[in-house]
Amino acid sequence: MDIIKKIKKSKSLWAILPSLNATDIEEALSVSSEYYHNTGTSLISDQEYDILMDRLKELNPSSKIFAQVGAPVKGKKVKLPFWMGSMNKIKADEKAVNKWLNEYSGPYVISDKLDGISCLLTIKNNKTKLYTRGDGTYGQDITHLLGLINIDIGLLEEIDQDIAIRGELIMSKKNFEKYQEIMANARNMVGGIVNSKPESVNKDHAADVDLIFYEVIKPNDKLSRQLKILKEWGLKVVYYNIYKTFDVNILESVLSERKKKSGYEIDGIIVTDNNKHVRNISGNPSYSFAFKGDTPTIDTVVKRVIWTPSKDGVLVPRIKFKKVRLSNVDLEYTTGFNAKYIVDNKIGSGAIINVVRSGDVIPYITHVVKPAKKPDLPNIEYVWDKNGVNIILADINDNETVIIKRLTKFMRNIGAENISEGITTRLVEAGFDTIPKIINMTEEDFLTIDGFQERLAEKIYNNLQNSLDNLDILTLMDASNIFGRGFGTKKFKKILDVYPNIVNQYTKETDNIWRKKLLDIEGFDTITVNKFLGEMPNFQKFYKVINKTITIKPYISEVNSEGIFQNQTVVFTGFRNADWQKFIENEGGKVSGSVSKNTSLLVYNDGEESSAKYQKAKQLGIKTMTKSSFSKKFEK
């Protein structure tokens, strides 16, 4: 789950993809697949899943991940009477599509790829069964849902032969509208229903689930005939059309149209050769493939790498390339991630890179098509960090860009309005290049700054003084930037909640005592504690200087040390409530986004016992409470 959390925290998967190795990607794919197929929960998007699969093919083409179908069933499982495979995927790649077309002469059935829960329905000796796909070999028996979901059982009873048919349990866009406030998407909704125990299924919710069929396994025939048989039986059938031929452009057009017009969520289209084929008993059929389209990318030539120091002195690469137009937008810059990426991929003038617009917003490099002769590194002194990932200015404290960024951060963090990086730059250029110098500035001093008129000088001065009047030790620790990367309000708050006077009480002689105390705080390891205490003497010196000019207010913890949620972890599902989160934290607890063995309480929407988090909480024996019960008990 650590890799999944890393992906979720990133602005875009492309931003962290270069840092993931094959093992990382296999973990992310395995965990997300397990959640997707066993709980109905999508930890990552379909696009992110496909990107990770493509990257894994580059790093480890023989990975076991590529042989997996679905995910192993959790809980009671049954052997499926027929193999339930998946589909090979082809992107918007003209060569790959043409290669497939050369093998299969058509005609072709193009149908919707429904984004629901894959299942198998069988009738044998007049006995009807319904199964989930599971891992293709073993699934769950969910026959109990047949009397609850939106399917006419009478139609099945009229079928007077043994059959095996595949379909998708899915909720229509229209039906899902009533649930969109409590569930992220229709698939998660259906997944929760499917994974509920028979006695816990919400019947009203289940009644909104359709079963759409798309394959007749037994009796076998060409696909168009299979779909016709399903219609003759009166069952709901996937949307499809028959084509004499097609190309990539037609597939893109069909996909775009179906995403707009389909009454159900689809995550692609399925292309099948419309001739009779021997059904495969393992792997995926060669005569069909899934087409999901492709995120537009384009090759371009690197002009240079621009290195800019961060407030911590880390030199951050930004790549300027020959201007290109992608998705109707002109692009000429992208992130270079870090120095290691630039060096490993030899990115410099003349390199050819492939660029994608992530989410149609930010451009990222997907891969390097042709490296430069050598990487484009900065012409200033720098050192590598201990991990060999970033390069850092050799002389951080005297770099003007670093000084400006640190001062800007200080002003922003203390709440000094209108003191932007532009204003800070002018102050530094005028010689006011330290925090003590700036907080001691008079209104007359501001008037000496180039471009400052009386009104602006008065405004900036008053805003600064107002923020300094309310400055407490927590804000000062965060704004100072003395403790460096990895430290922010949350970590400082954790320390001050327990030891509010640590700044005044710490001495070198008591270092070992404080080290033991801080290691007892949740989330603090040896590296964090060593870094914090290592910088404490520097912060104490800074604090004394600042305290001569203004009075720093002490930190007053809002946390009740004997609170009713002391050392407890609460999870909300189906809703968010900032006031309740603050209440729980002030009472000594914390709010998490996922259910685990460390969860103390799950609060869920009334009637939402079918949600994946609720089911997991019950499996782990975690206490649960409805939203209305929580409100009645704790809101006054």
From Swiss-Prot:
Signal sequence segment: none
Consequence recorded when altering D46A: Complete loss of nick sealing activity in vitro. 98% loss of ligase adenylation activity in vitro
Cross-referenced CDD domains: BRCT_DNA_ligase_like (cd17748)
Keywords of this entry: DNA replication, Ligase, NAD
EC number: 6.5.1.2
Effect annotated for changing Y36A: 90% loss of nick sealing activity in vitro. Complete loss of ligase adenylation activity in vitro
One GO BP: DNA repair
Catalytic residue list: K113 (n6-amp-lysine intermediate)
Reactions it catalyzes: NAD(+) + (deoxyribonucleotide)n-3'-hydroxyl + 5'-phospho-(deoxyribonucleotide)m = (deoxyribonucleotide)n+m + AMP + beta-nicotinamide D-nucleotide
Superkingdom as given in the UniProt entry: Viruses
Effect of substituting D50A: No effect on nick sealing activity in vitro. Complete loss of ligase adenylation activity in vitro
SMART domains, alphabetized: BRCT, LIGANc
InterPro entries: BRCT_dom (IPR001357), BRCT_dom_sf (IPR036420), DNA_ligase (IPR001679), DNA_repair_Rad51/TF_NusA_a-hlx (IPR010995), DNAligase_adenylation (IPR013839), DNAligase_N (IPR013840), NA-bd_OB-fold (IPR012340), NAD_DNA_ligase_OB (IPR004150)
Protein name per Swiss-Prot or TrEMBL: DNA ligase
